[in-house]
Design a protein with these regions (language model features):
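A polyanion-binding, active-site-adjacent surface
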Residues: 1-189
């Protein structure tokens, strides 16, 4: 990925930001693209939106280091603009390789760019967020991007519903059983 020159985004960046976390995680979060802080540090979701994502994970008792977090594009779009469809398309080879290597059972799509790129170009996050979609044995949950929640805090209750739904799906699929007891079984520990 470091040598990638498939689109023009790589020309004005400090770092490519492939993603980080548990490379064997059954849960993957996919956002839009790196922001300024991520570009400077070379790590995904470490700026204000990443700090909010960490708090959202903590709210459902899921340590951040137990999931994998990445973005559709691996280079920061100028001015933090939405990646162009051709930029997202160029980066899909990297995302496909990540999902193939990690093999998540559940993917949370953070924001409309991730949902439009991976589900449907006509996807509308305000209408379709929070609805589970199963593709090739992988469950996907589109929800608001944390940066959208920072811009519009009135969406936080819906995002909280989605996080509770995520927790319930992880229980249903018997994932993170050391953290979540499956329905009807005693709590671990």
């Amino acid at each position: 990925m470091e040598a990638c020159r498939l689109c023009s985004l790589c020309r004005q960046i400090h770092h490519k930001v492939p993603g980080q976390g548990d490379r064997h995680a059954p849960l993957m979060f996919i956002g839009e693209g790196p922001g300024q802080v991520e570009d400077e540090e070379g790590l995904a979701f470490v700026g204000p939106a990443g700090q909010l994502l960490t708090r959202m994970l903590e709210a459902i008792h899921l340590p951040r280091d137990r999931v994998y977090i990445c973005n559709i594009v691996k280079c920061r779009p100028p001015g933090n603009r939405v990646p162009a469809p051709e930029e997202a398309e160029a980066c899909l080879i990297h995302l496909r390789m990540q999902t193939w290597l990690i093999r998540p059972k559940v993917i949370v799509l953070l924001g409309s760019t991730a949902a439009k790129t991976l589900l449907d170009p006509d996807f509308r996050i305000t209408r379709e967020r929070g609805k589970w979609i199963e593709r090739k044995g992988v469950w996907m949950l589109p929800t608001y991007h944390p940066s959208a929640l920072l811009r519009d805090p009135s969406k936080k209750p819906q995002a909280w519903e989605d996080m509770q739904s995520l927790r319930d799906k992880l229980r249903e699929l018997h994932l993170y059983t050391d953290l979540y007891a499956p329905p009807g079984s005693p709590s671990p520990g």
